[in-house]
């Protein structure tokens, strides 16, 4: 190999290594403010099934902060964040916070998952419309998990694609709980 080609190859490798280093050290994506393609009333009225087959909607949590998490049993980041959501549900439930997980999978599979992993907050099944609702709430990539936080007036205020860090969610819920105390 000639010296010219060696120099070019070393330069190219340096550029690739620098790019990889920059991408690896990039801070995690912050939750985005939601600009949904759907009205809050439509989201609150959307029908889901609980694990016993009953009809449910987010509208039943009127006056509460709702953390809506789109997930699947096969999704590794979903499984990783669920224990944190379980802890946060226990911590903030008395302050009017309600976590709800929604999956497009079949009820028996979700029920088995809930029992196996000890998930006690509501897990609902939404069927084929779940991916479209998630997209309309800001999930342009169509990936899981996708979390949307609604304020007490049922307006979506924050959404995040990917696992939601426990400390970030805890800070957000503390702010939302403080707002409700002041009112």
Which residues does each predicted region cover?
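N-terminal targeting signals for export/organelle localization
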Residues: 1-45, 183
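A short beta-strand-turn-helix
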Residues: 38-40, 45-66, 89
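Active-site acidic short loop of glycosyltransferases
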Residues: 61-64, 94, 120
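Aromatic-flanked redox-active Cys/Sec active sites in thiol-based oxidoreductases
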Residues: 69-74, 104
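C-type cytochrome heme c attachment motif
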Residues: 73-80, 143-146
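Structural microenvironment flanking redox-active thiols in thiol-disulfide oxidoreductases
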Residues: 79-118, 128-135
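Thiol/disulfide oxidoreductase modules built on the thioredoxin-like
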Residues: 115-119, 126-175
